[in-house]
Amino acid sequence: MQATHSSSNQASAGVYGKVYLIGAGPGAADLITVRGAKLLAQADVVLHDALVTEEMLALCPQALKIAVGKRCGKLSTAQQFINKQLVDNARKYALVVRLKGGDPMLFGRADEELRALEKHGIEVEVVPGISAALAAAATSQQPLTKRGVARSVAFFTSSTAPGESDQVNIPSCDTLVQYMGGREATATAQRLLAQGRAASTPVVVVENCSRDNQRILRLRLDELESGLQQCEGPVLVMIGEALASRAQQPIETNQQQQQDSQNVA
């Protein structure tokens, strides 16, 4: 499909278009921001991740679409090639969208793409999206923080670049959220148990978050390995006492609330 807003004189005149790094959100097309949807409807070309759905791409029927997917364990597009595609398309088109799953600034390789665009003096804007961690917490109705139980949250991934050690330090936080979990989350569970974390620690796994085939697994830490064997799609793993069911968590008393208010004051 040909783009509708391209400028044939851009390349010859040395003029670049503007590039938007847009967060597509966790998956469902209606979870993209209003600004993101408006820009998609105006885009000349959209370079999109592998996890972006057809329903999301239907928001930009006028645009040329280029798949530049990166999936763990699958054939992926090299990041240098993606960077070059962004620059080359900014030479051809006035409005270029780089559509990323979740939020561009969290495990989205945004730094590398921003550097490539800035090197060529190309104007760029980042449009945030709903990250998978927040969407998973919402869809499972499990807050990541809870007064008196969990005051800190860490987002991390065990996926590493070639040549890097695969022994990623596990953050020391009340609630752990592991992106791109899969096999790596099994190793995380084993290490946490070896470090003395209780086997009964609550775990919530969300597979295919916000999509029609979404699935939520509620497990214990010592059940995570067997639970993940059921999963085939992208998963996000949340670990910590805040993930216990509300029936298992005490209701905060007025006295506790007053004490916390005094401590804050």
Go through each PLM region and give its residues.
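A contiguous loop/helix-start segment that scaffolds small-molecule binding in enzyme catalytic cores
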Residues: Q2-N9, Y16-L21, R91-V96, S152, ...
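Short, well-ordered alpha-helical microsegments
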Residues: T53-M56, A133, G163, A185-T186
